[in-house]
Curated annotation (Swiss-Prot):
It catalyses: Release of an N-terminal tripeptide from a polypeptide, but also has endopeptidase activity. It comes from Canis lupus familiaris (Dog). Keywords: Autocatalytic cleavage, Calcium, Disulfide bond, Glycoprotein, Hydrolase, Lysosome, Metal-binding, Protease, Serine protease, Signal, Zymogen. This is Tripeptidyl-peptidase 1. The lineage of its organism: Eukaryota, Metazoa, Chordata, Craniata, Vertebrata. The active site is at E272, D276, S475. One of its GO terms (biological process) is nervous system development. Gene3D superfamilies: Peptidase S8/S53 domain.
């Protein structure tokens, strides 16, 4: 014990001197709106911290993703197994040994890794963690839509410089739970209902996107789909059953989730969770559905990071995953964003389709040195996910053509360069759009998003046994598009073809084939004199508001069923 204390003391002296480094110097450490500090945490309280170990062969992984995702490649659709990915990226023995010894000397307990061995999660007391991570100071905070409690440090932390080649970042310190892409709008007023609908339901979705009663899962394949839940959001099985009773009468469907991965709470259902499950399972009807429930088993855990760890630890996963959460790019450290992006590369190499909501703040807005700029969202801005924007009906009470939903997130990343698969489409947009914002507001050479869109306005949801109208946001459009891709995977599997995997290279090569082009409307942005609240506007072809457009199922199936 005396030796361990001595080692910790030496480490603390080292960290306080020049032999330390900060893994995340650019991580935002301000308290997010809606959160309040409850004070310091007791020094003997236990924390669960996740150490992201430096991976190997990331460049090679990137090339493999390109090979298995490009229809023009001879390796298209020849996905890697989890074991293949682990063999490629697992940290060097030196990295694993160095970090383990460092943690053991600090008194870390119950450490466990994942199949790919690139994350290590350990338990430490607050006192041990603050000695280990010099500068960290843990407080308990309460906030979020469900008033959850988390333990975080708003102060920068440092590690011994000897660990710089071995540790990307430490999870469980700074990042608060991600925000949801969900709004509830007041119900529009309408007189008379003949020939009208009073909100988006599965039958409206199926009518608009040309899904027939026969467009459901066959029940004979190993096809599956999943959505992820955070922020202590839970769905209730009884709500799903009631939703299908009310709205699922004209198509075959499953009225229960096949598997819940993680903890499913017993509290009140969340509208977000209910929406995701109900519309993933009604768009991707009669297809086995998993729910990843990652509230964070402990106050110090990061739910989104826990979900990524689950993906790195299971060999057999659903083919399509939809996630309706995100953060502002500028609120996250470069180390964290780049590492999470690599996790998405790992998923793409395995043939998983990851869909993320584009957000509900239009182009976003923030002020840098008193100058306004648009504010992109992550993971929506990752070049290895398919990002889904939002639309509204031109006539809100009729199944008509779609226009931009003004809240639909979209824009250009300030972190990721523009991937080659979308360069031609972006150049075409920038050279032809008559309503471009000033160039100082966005990074025209960054990854542009969204890639596609779907209806995001005026949904009916059943939550806590109550039908709730006019729920809106790209949290709605994302599971709808995901369910439709699951139906296409069903046809591919029945034809002996691999699942779609990472969709973007094929999507951009086909230049919107199988999608309804949305050409009217603009989304919101900065409320200043220069742009007056207007961000980007949609137009013919791809645009950074609705991507290539919304699904026309028969045409999209025809475009994507080809080998």
């Amino acid at each position: 014990m005396r030796l361990r204390t001595c080692l910790l003391g030496l480490l603390a002296l080292c960290v306080a001197s020049k032999c330390s480094y900060s893994p995340e110097p650019d991580q935002q450490r301000t308290l997010p709106p809606g959160w309040v500090s409850l004070g310091r945490v007791d020094s003997e309280e236990e924390l669960s911290l996740t150490f992201a170990l430096r991976q190997q062969n990331v460049e090679r992984l990137s090339k493999l993703v390109q090979a298995v995702s490009d229809p023009g490649s001879p390796h298209y659709g020849k996905y890697l197994t989890l074991e293949d990915v682990a063999e490629l990226v697992r940290p060097s023995p030196l990295t694993f040994r160095t970090v383990q010894k460092w943690l053991s000397a600090a008194g870390a307990r119950n450490c466990h890794s994942v199949t790919t061995q690139d994350f290590l999660t350990c338990w430490l007391s607050v006192r041990q963690a603050e000695l280990l991570l010099s500068g960290a100071e843990f407080h308990r905070y309460v906030g979020g839509p469900t008033e959850i409690h988390v333990i975080r440090s708003l102060r920068p932390y440092q590690l011994p410089k000897a660990l710089a080649p071995h540790v990307d970042f430490v999870g469980g310190l700074h990042r608060f739970p991600p925000t949801s892409s969900l709004r509830q709008r007041p119900e529009p007023q309408v007189s008379g209902t003949v020939g009208l609908h009073l909100g988006v339901t599965p039958s409206v979705i199926r009518q608009r996107y040309n899904l027939t009663a026969q467009d459901v899962g066959s029940g004979t394949t190993n096809n599956s789909q999943a959505c992820a839940q955070f922020l202590e959001q839970y769905f209730h099985a009884s709500d799903l059953a009631e939703f299908m009773r009310l709205f699922g009468g004209n198509f075959a469907h499953q009225a229960s989730v096949a598997r819940v991965v993680g903890q499913q709470g017993r509290g009140r259902a969340g509208i977000e969770a209910s929406l995701d499950v109900e519309y993933l399972m009604s768009a991707g009807a009669n297809i086995s559905t998993w729910v990843y429930s990652s509230p964070g088993r402990h106050e110090s855990q990061e739910p989104f990071l826990q979900w990524l760890l689950l993906l790195s630890n299971e060999s057999a996963l659903p083919h399509v995953h939809t996630v309706s959460y995100g953060d502002d790019e500028d609120s996250l450290s470069s180390a964290y964003i780049q590492r999470v992006n690599t996790e998405f590369m790992k998923a793409a190499a395995r043939g998983l389709t990851l869909l993320f909501a584009s957000g509900d703040s239009g182009a976003g807005c923030w002020s840098v040195s008193r100058r306004h700029q648009f504010r992109p969202s992550f993971p929506a801005s990752s070049p290895y996910v398919t990002t889904v924007g939002g639309t509204s009906f031109q006539n809100p009470f009729r199944v008509t053509t779609e226009i931009v939903d003004y809240i639909s997130g979209g824009g250009f990343s300030n972190v990721f360069p523009q991937p080659s698969y979308q360069e031609e489409a972006v150049v075409q947009f920038l050279s032809s759009s008559p309503h471009l914002p000033p160039s100082s507001y966005f990074n025209a050479s960054g990854r542009a998003y969204p890639d596609v869109a779907a209806l995001s306005d005026g949904y009916w949801v059943v939550s806590n046994s109550v039908p709730i109208p006019w729920v809106s946001g790209t949290s709605a459009s994302t599971p709808v598009f995901g369910g439709i891709l699951s139906l296409i995977n069903e046809h591919r599997l029945l034809s002996g073809l691999p699942p779609l995997g990472f969709l973007n290279p094929r999507l951009y090569q086909q230049r919107g084939a199988g999608l309804f082009d949305v050409t009217r409307g603009c989304h919101e942005s900065c409320l200043n004199e220069e742009v007056q609240g207007q961000g980007f506007c949609s137009g013919p072809g791809w645009d950074p508001v609705t991507g290539w457009g919304t699904p026309n199922f028969p045409a999209l199936l025809k475009a994507l069923i080809k080998p």
